[in-house]
């Protein structure tokens, strides 16, 4: 039997800021369990904390941001997206294919970018 190809993905998840700490951790566990349940493996998790949203989304003005690097078969991504759409605690998400895991997240100021 041939083994399915595991691609590396970067997922950004915004979880509702109205949840209790316990409920928020359960929502994050649900995301991680979904990934591993579809044959994926979590490589790195960056907790970005509570942040103001750029614009209001379904009545939410703030959310907890999580950046997750994981491997999974490409066939799992559409199944994960379906699960994410049904997760009421998840305000927004995006999943992108990437080439490397960022061990440390740093942002440049506007002056540094010019």
Curated annotation (Swiss-Prot):
Name of the gene this protein is made from: rpsF
Keywords: Ribonucleoprotein, Ribosomal protein, RNA-binding, rRNA-binding
Domain of life from the UniProt record: Bacteria
Protein's recorded name: Small ribosomal subunit protein bS6
CDD domains per UniProt: bS6 (cd00473)
Any Pfam family: Ribosomal_S6
InterPro entries, per the entry: Ribosomal_bS6, Ribosomal_bS6_sf, Ribosomal_S6_plastid/chlpt, Transl_elong_EF1B/ribsomal_bS6
Organism this protein belongs to: Protochlamydia amoebophila (strain UWE25)
Gene Ontology CC: cytoplasm; ribonucleoprotein complex; ribosome
Gene Ontology BP, a term: translation
Family as reported in the entry's similarity comment: Belongs to the bacterial ribosomal protein bS6 family.
Purpose of the protein: Binds together with bS18 to 16S ribosomal RNA.
Gene Ontology terms for molecular function: small ribosomal subunit rRNA binding; structural constituent of ribosome
């Amino acid at each position: 039997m041939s083994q399915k190809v595991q691609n590396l993905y970067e997922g950004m998840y915004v979880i509702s800021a109205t949840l209790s700490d316990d409920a928020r951790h359960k929502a994050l566990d649900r995301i991680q369990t979904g990934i591993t349940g579809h044959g994926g493996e979590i490589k790195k998790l960056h907790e970005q904390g509570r942040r103001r949203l750029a614009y209001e989304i379904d009545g939410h003005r703030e959310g907890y941001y999580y950046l997750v690097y994981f491997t999974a078969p490409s066939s799992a991504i559409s199944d994960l997206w379906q699960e994410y759409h049904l997760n009421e605690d998840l305000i927004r998400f995006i999943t992108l294919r990437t080439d490397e895991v960022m061990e440390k997240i740093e942002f440049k100021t506007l002056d540094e970018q010019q």
